[in-house]
Amino acid sequence: MRVSWISGLLLVAHLAPSSAFNPLRFFLDDTFSSGATEEHFMGPSDDGFALQQPTNYDPSMPFPLDESASAAVDAVSNNYIVMFKPSVDKSKLEQHHRWIEHLHEKRSLDFKDVSTFLMKHTFEIGDAFLGYAGRFSPWLVAELQKHPDIALVEPDRVMHVMTEQTFAPWGLARVSHRKKLGFFTMTRYQYNETAGEGVTAYVIDTGINIEHQDFQGRATWGATIPTGEGEVDDHGHGTHVAGTIAGKTFGVSKNAKLVAVKVMRADGTGTVSDIIKGIEFAFKQSKKDKESIASVVNMSIGGDASTALDLAVNAAIAGGLFFAVAAGNDAEDACGTSPARVSNAMTVGASTWNDQIASFSNIGSCVDIFAPGSLILSDWIGSNRASMILSGTSMASPHVAGLAAYFISLDPSLANHPVELKKYMLKFALKDLLNGIPEDTPNVLAFNNYE
């Protein structure tokens, strides 16, 4: 048995989503647009290209066109995310992109139109998510929406981090005690010493202060997705989250490794397309990692509903990655935000030290579990010893990501089976202890099953 004492209180981290900047939220959005009216590039013809006429998109397909997103307040002008139907083979990507270039060149010649065409990202996450993102003129977007191979054309949007600075720490104790915390248990964290050993946690966020002494050299820099950004957490949100997952002092899984995947800028905003690219990196890197028995992901970010983002998360989960995601900080239905509404992810709401639902926490049937998210102390930026107290579902989610790593280290048969792992964690979670939970919201509190 291992008991960790933290001066004052113990803490847990958590993240939450939103569509407009709010100190309680962590959103990200960057818009991309693409459109196509003709189908496949088939080869030379009279004018050098032969284009098949498109057919209408079949509404019975599982991924509908998301036209409602075009009116999103945080949409980035002329930036879109484009997804192919599941039936499209990745071998067709090159000819599809050549087809777009041909359309663009032909338009420029025919209409003397100096229009926008900039490819930003291509996406490939397992067998279920194939697409790209970029900046495209409205006429090209219209063409893409009619293309028979395209399942989704969605505006890229801005998201933000979801946190609120507050006063004091407390949370690790709560995830290791069955009963409500009291004087003698408030600062007592009970856990098995394996504590995430052999598991890697990908923190898709603002980055990590990897030199912080609390990480003991177990944190590395994985990828920087936004253009013009450096390999540094210049916001602090990601470092705080990482500390809750695997910090020596503040972490649930004190032996897990951490990988920084920076998708958010210093102001706490980022684009959906950059987030999807970060998910792709974590997925592919986890497959290359032969040293870890499994990997988990924490995403304490979110915003307005995004079909593209939801599908990217689902594809990674189908490929074996566990995702803990923040429910959001708007005290509203989490089913209206992404990625909180992803059914196979573990969506985390925030609770307080006295077992109340946090006033800001999102609610509803899409919330799977609650974890400490109010007044959470964890690691910070500015020095290799810095700490900070924050509140938010962004602080709650890392508690659950840490617990996922913890349970995998105890039972390696759970590795690479995220849906089964989620069921396992819900099985041992504490039921009907929280106050203030609406009837349509599961009354479930994260627990490490140590007692």
Swiss-Prot record:
The keyword Metal-binding does not apply. The keyword Acetylation does not apply. PROSITE patterns: SUBTILASE, SUBTILASE_ASP, SUBTILASE_HIS, SUBTILASE_SER. Residues 80-161 form the Inhibitor I9 domain. GO terms for cellular component: extracellular space; fungal-type vacuole; fungal-type vacuole lumen. It holds the Pfam family Inhibitor_I9. InterPro entries: PCSK9_ProteinaseK-like (IPR034193), Peptidase_S8/S53_dom (IPR000209), Peptidase_S8/S53_dom_sf (IPR036852), Peptidase_S8_Asp-AS (IPR023827), Peptidase_S8_His-AS (IPR022398), Peptidase_S8_Ser-AS (IPR023828), Peptidase_S8_subtilisin-like (IPR050131), Peptidase_S8_subtilisin-rel (IPR015500). Its EC number is 3.4.21.-. It is an enzyme of class 3 (hydrolase). Disulfide bonds: none annotated. It comes from the Eukaryota. GO terms for molecular function: peptidase activity; serine-type endopeptidase activity. Keywords: Hydrolase, Protease, Serine protease, Signal. One of its GO terms (biological process) is zymogen activation. The active site is at 205 (charge relay system), 237 (charge relay system), 394 (charge relay system). Residues 1-20 form the signal peptide. This is Subtilase-type proteinase psp3.
